[in-house]
Amino acid sequence: MHLIFCGTPHFAVPTLEKLIAAKFAISLVITNPDEPSGRGYELKAPPVKQAALAAGLEVYQPAKLKDPATVELISRHRPDAIVVVAYGHILPKWMIDLPRLGCINLHASLLPKYRGAAPIQWSLIRGETVTGVTTMRIDVGLDTGDILLKRELPIQDDDTSETLGEGLSQVGADLMVETLRRLEQGDLQAQPQDHPQATLAPILKKEDGRIDWNLPALEIWNRIRGLRPWPVAYTRFRGKNLHIWAASRPAAGEGVQLDPGLLIAEHGRLRVVCGQGTVLEAKEIQLEGRKRMPARDFLNGTKIAPGEKVE
């Protein structure tokens, strides 16, 4: 089977590497252009490009997929299938129609749940205990194509979008290999999605990180897990942003009759009153302009006044 692979971030690298190890013939790897990075704004290659070049594969980095030169180059490869993993662009119809076995996407949720750009983050934010990956045939909609295979992965209490993404990338890589092998053998039939059951996972915005302390502590804890490494959950403290990188899983309602946002600093612990009588303990924080640190270290250098709040 001859493939074209489309992908960009680290999440896509395990799939590319396992397809190579499984001896699929990958004639072209398509990824985003290099982007400026760091203080010096030096161009940095996407992780998929780095992995592809290390494997001796041809790499193409078009800014657009509809210009004539790109259409001609991709069409010339005549792929049996195009594999898409977190590429970052919507494929045009000419490209969807090109391969005989279709364009096969790896999506980091159990479709039709969490269609969109941020399924890993939203599965955590919504408090899911199980998620997974889906291989699907791409159509002209947003993650609406027919499903090929699914595989579940439990969500652990200590998972963040970083750790969950790493786990899903490995599970998804194996699932893509299985999907392509079964398509090649002709024993895999795609099934339509149950569209009325669809939920969305839109791209995150910076303002999504702002914590509403009127919510129950469990909901806030889930947001903290899901919003790493960007935009990171934050609140306002003494006129500055205070990012909360990690917190302890809250206990059931503690019956605290205090105002949401009130800080409780005692015995080296930093806790915040939340909605419905609950309390959240922050474990790792970062005040604007300072480095990340354990909450205990923050309290060693910052005295919390009685009645002081975050907002």
Over which residues does each language-model region extend?
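Conserved beta-strand segments of alpha/beta enzyme cores
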Residues: 25, 56-58, 102
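An anion-binding loop in the catalytic cleft
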Residues: 214-311
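Short beta->alpha connector loops
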Residues: 8-11, 63-66, 87-90
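N-terminal glycine-/serine-/threonine-rich beta1-alpha1-beta2 phosphate-ribose binding loop
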Residues: 36-80
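Donor/substrate-binding cores of folate-linked one-carbon enzymes
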Residues: 22, 32, 81-200, 205-207
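N-terminal Rossmann-like dinucleotide-binding module
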Residues: 1-40
